[in-house]
Amino acid sequence: MDFSQRTKMVVGESPFEKVTDKKICVVGVGGVGGAALEGLVRFGMKNITIFDFDTVDITNLNRQIISTRDVVGINKTEVAANRAKSINPDINIRTVNVFIEKDNLQLIKDEKPDYVIDAIDSVKAKLDLIEFCHRENIPIISSMGTGNRLNCTGFVIDKVEKTAGNGCGLSKVMRQELKKRGITGHTSLFNTRPPESKAVNSANGRNAPGSCPFAPNVAGLMVAQYVVSQLL
């Protein structure tokens, strides 16, 4: 039996076949990106390329859907691809185990994506990816911060300018820096509510945000749904 049978009942068989042939790039497969990938795979998307340079860490277990104890230390791209294939063995999923930055953004274009999901944390890399996609006319949606939240209500998808006053540090920086680069109206997922706690110094001395399983997974599924809806 076709595992997508019930999905087709929602969107219709012809639109389903059309949209699932599209190519999606997911940049970062951690909390938000991993959940977005999960949604795309379970929906039935057939062609996905995932980018990440990191390995699964024990601290990922509280929120990242791809992480389990038996894959700690393994490349996230490998883990995510294996999970995708366990859901749909016929999926065409490519893995690129790199940190996306200005010098290798051509890798994105080479995939000829119909949509890019930006789920990376590095501000500079995020800015460069967004600028590149806007310049190359590649549709892209970016996730802003999902840390320091227990309550996962308040997530919306709108222009990045609408993040003003939401208390998210990443949103503020992205809003300011994108404006400097002449980019307006960038589609972003963000929360309209302020974070419930502040970043604290972790054991390694970094200013790290707290996290719970709810917000990043809700955010990732919202991003996946938005992309599918835009392509239908």
Model-derived segments and spans:
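N-terminal charged helix/coil linker that caps or initiates catalytic domains
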Residues: 1-25, 58
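Hydrophobic/small residue at the entry helix of a nucleotide-binding pocket
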Residues: 32-33
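Conserved S-adenosyl-L-methionine
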Residues: 42-47
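Conserved SAM/SAH-binding loop
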Residues: 97-105
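Glycine-rich phosphate-binding loop and adjoining beta1-alpha1-beta2 segment
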Residues: 50-88
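Conserved N-terminal Rossmann-fold NAD(P)-binding element of oxidoreductases
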Residues: 26-28, 51
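Glycine-rich phosphate/adenylate-binding loop
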Residues: 111-114, 120-127, 135-136, 140, ...
